[in-house]
Every structure is written in structure tokens, then in C-alpha cells.
From Swiss-Prot:
UniProt KW keywords: Aminoacyl-tRNA synthetase, ATP-binding, Cytoplasm, Ligase, Magnesium, Metal-binding, Nucleotide-binding, Protein biosynthesis
Reactions mediated catalytically: tRNA(Phe) + L-phenylalanine + ATP = L-phenylalanyl-tRNA(Phe) + AMP + diphosphate + H(+)
EC top class, as a word: ligase
Matches recorded under NCBIfam families: pheS (TIGR00468)
Cofactor binding mode and count: Binds 2 magnesium ions per tetramer.
Cofactor(s) essential for the protein: Mg(2+)
PROSITE patterns (alphabetical): AA_TRNA_LIGASE_II
Protein's gene: pheS
GO molecular function, one term: magnesium ion binding
Lineage, highest ranks first: Bacteria, Bacillati, Bacillota, Bacilli, Bacillales
Subcellular location: Cytoplasm
Protein name as annotated: Phenylalanine--tRNA ligase alpha subunit
Pfam families, A to Z: Phe_tRNA-synt_N, tRNA-synt_2d
Amino acid sequence: MSEQQTMSELKQQALVDINEANDERALQEVKVKYLGKKGSVSGLMKLMKDLPNEDKPAFGQKVNELRQTIQNELDERQQMLVKEKLNKQLAEETIDVSLPGRHIEIGSKHPLTRTIEEIEDLFLGLGYEIVNGYEVEQDHYNFEMLNLPKSHPARDMQDSFYITDEILLRTHTSPVQARTMESRHGQGPVKIICPGKVYRRDSDDATHSHQFTQIEGLVVDKNVKMSDLKGTLELLAKKLFGADREIRLRPSYFPFTEPSVEVDVSCFKCKGKGCNVCKHTGWIEILGAGMVHPNVLEMAGFDSSEYSGFAFGMGPDRIAMLKYGIEDIRHFYTNDVRFLDQFKAVEDRGDM
């Protein structure tokens, strides 16, 4: 058999083996069989020793051409096998895009967070700045700077969480106001709100908690009047409870303001006619306020003959309870998903 015939038969057999390889592993075995170091094509080179010298270059060229032909067929078959494998995988893993997606539980903002942010947004629009402070506070800022002397009943150990004789968990966010005024060195204006957690030694029940949230506001400047306070609180009431709400100011007493008032809003449920929400009075108490006491201004470094101001404080817990008809303050702090899911639905409707 001539060398030419041998190469022709080898080529035909290689093409058959390549086409019959059904996976990449089988194709690799074919490659080794023909193109490996001990493969059939490499074996052809052994025939060169029996050829005349003038025929050896031509024979070597034909062997290299055969090697290249087989390699090209191998590469083409390799690409085809990869494509077939991918098509099979896609066919087996076909996704029906019309099927409903997997339900994923998504959280939402806590009702207290929503209420606090709503209040903050209002006052940011009025030019106030948000100031945060320490929850562990000095007695000096929590009481003395706010016109609460050592003998005041609010300083009783039974009413506050004292850590040492001079350190306690703040009972209100008013220390933030005191520290802010002190940091201004008697120069106005001051226009801030102070949100945060506060702590009091209350027994937990439906309307009381040892920990709750509070937002206080403070404005100090020249010629600040009671009418400025009233206008601010009217705007707040309308923002929180509806544009047709009215407010009522009742005389009260707070050590750090003079005069002091309790602020009521006309009942948003019965429109002032009387119901269980307003206890049949037509009014709902929402916060306390007043003009900053001259002693508080002086202790913070402000000249009370030149500067005046107003302050107010509210509990977002109570406001959220009123807005959403919540009867127990403890629901805010128990992380009951059944309770919180109700507000996710309200948020989805855009009612919050």
C-alpha cells in the first residue's frame, strides 16, 4: 500500500470517528488517537525513513496538511457539541415568563418612624434644623438648665432612671435645647427640633411606657411672640390631622416656659361633635408648649431683655395612636409582624 493511499484511508477514518463523537470526552479521545504523540498521524512520520531523500519534503508537507485538516474538523465538531449542549440545557430549563413570581415579604417603615418623619419634613420646610443629643444625660442639662431646681418633684428618684447622682437617662429631649442654646453663646436665632427616645419610671400599660419618643421644638430670637407659637402649632395640627382642624390653647404650667399652655386639636373623627376618641369633648390634647422662661434664657447665656422664644413638645407615640386608631402604646415596641403588616398596607395605599 502506498503512502498516499495510507494517508487517504487515515483521513477518512478520522472524519468518521470525529462525526461519531457524541460528547467532548469522546472527541478528546479521537484527538489523542490521531494527533497525540503516539497517534496515527505521528506514526506516518516513521515511513519517511524508507523514502528517497527527494520525496521526503513533499511527504512531510502532506502529513502536516493531514494534521491540520483533522484539527480543523475537531475544532468544528467541538463548537457543534458545545452548541448542542447549550440548546439542550435551554430546552430543559425553559422558563415560563407568564408564571407568577415567587412572593417575597417586604418590610415597611414603622408607624412611629413615619410619624416622626412627617413632623420633621414640616419643620425642615419652615427652616428648622434637626438636632440630636445624648440619651444618657447630665442632671445639669436635664433639669437645672431648664429651671428645675434640686427640690423639684420631677427630680424624684422614683420618676427618673438615675445612673449616678449626676447622670441619668434623659426624661425629655429638652437637654438638647439647653445644650444648643448654650453653644450659641447668647447669639440668635435658634430654630431647632429635637427628636429622640426618652425614659421615665412609668409602669407599662396601654397608654404609658418606660421608653417612648418625643419631639421638642425651640425658637429663640428677637421679638418672638405667643402669636408666632400659635401660628406654628396651627400649621402642625393641619399637617397631621387635616386641613380643617382647629386648635385650642389652655393655660397650664411647665417650669421651663411662662406662660405655658396645653394644646388641643378639634377631633378629626367626629368633627367636634363628641365621640369616644375625644371623650365626647370635641377636643383632643396633643402637646404642651409655651414661651421660654426668662430663667432658661439667662442660664443658657441669652439676654432675656433682648431675646424671647417659644418651645413645644409632643409625643409621636400619642400622635400615631390618634392618627391610626391604636389603643395600646405597647404595640409599637413588641415587633409583632401582624401589627406592623397593617401599616404596610396603609403605606401601599399612600395613606401614610
